[in-house]
A protein has these predicted regions:
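Metal-dependent nuclease catalytic cores that hydrolyze phosphodiester bonds in DNA/RNA
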Residues: 1-109, 116-122, 126, 140, ...
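Metal-dependent nuclease catalytic regions and adjoining charged, substrate-binding loops involved
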Residues: 1-7, 138-231
Length: 231
């Protein structure tokens, strides 16, 4: 993807987002495979033809800026921070993932997310859980034990006024702009996520042999997915 800076915004902003768009042969990230596969493959195939201006990438900048700040924090002796893992599947493709923190004592993988308040109101956590589950699966391939995951969220549009209104109406609204949600994993969950990963990459391997117009269209669920959130 070609990132432009038509409005001459500060160079650090441009550098921040421009470093995000790199593709490797036969390798896709945990986040990427949650997208519609046709969109994923066509974006990779035609990346040099796609253009986006830094002025339209506020959501990405917010998320990256948050991670840059948290990178400076000191991890504990039982913690692994900002680790990048890659695992090769039997078909020669690789799945990668970069999680924010793993705590060996808690046997928990953790990630930081920026989101809209609607994410919490609708409790729409399926994509978060699946992404962290893939990270957990990658960790188990490196002989780490993972029993749960934790999402630490930062709500960008949280409003104290809306919170008070929701209280008066008896409606749910998150009490704070920063919080966390947790999920636990069973052995059966790891069997299922491995099956999902293998099937996903087998589909990718098949689709990459097809012409653009021969690749099946994304499912309705996939079309609603937008990378870090559901539209």
């Amino acid at each position: 993807m070609k990132v432009t800076n038509k409005y001459n915004l500060p160079q650090p902003l441009y550098n921040l987002v421009n470093s995000e768009y790199t593709y490797k042969d036969k390798q896709f990230s945990a986040t990427a495979i949650l997208q519609g596969l046709k969109s994923l493959i066509l974006t990779k195939r035609h990346t040099d033809e796609i253009e986006q201006d830094v002025s339209d990438m506020a959501n990405l900048i917010f998320g990256l800026a948050l991670h840059k700040v948290l990178e400076d924090s000191q991890e504990g002796d039982d913690e692994l921070k900002e680790a990048y893992l890659v695992y090769m599947l039997e078909n020669g493709y690789k799945v990668s993932g970069r999680f924010d923190l793993y705590n060996e004592t808690e046997m928990s993988v953790k990630d930081y997310k920026t989101c809209s308040v609607w994410k919490l109101k609708f409790k729409d956590f399926d994509d978060w859980k699946k992404q962290l589950h893939i990270y957990a699966w990658l960790l188990t391939k490196c002989d780490f034990q993972v029993d749960k995951c934790e999402i630490n969220y930062f709500i960008k549009d949280w409003s104290p006024k809306e919170f008070k209104i929701a209280q008066l109406k008896g409606e749910y609204y998150p009490e704070h702009a920063i919080g966390k949600v947790e999920f636990t994993f069973t052995k059966e969950d790891f069997v299922e996520i491995e099956k999902y990963i293998v099937e996903r990459f087998n589909q990718i391997a098949t689709y990459e042999t097809l012409e653009d117009d021969e690749i099946p269209v994304c499912s309705e669920e996939e079309r609603w997915y937008s990378g870090s959130k559901w539209a």
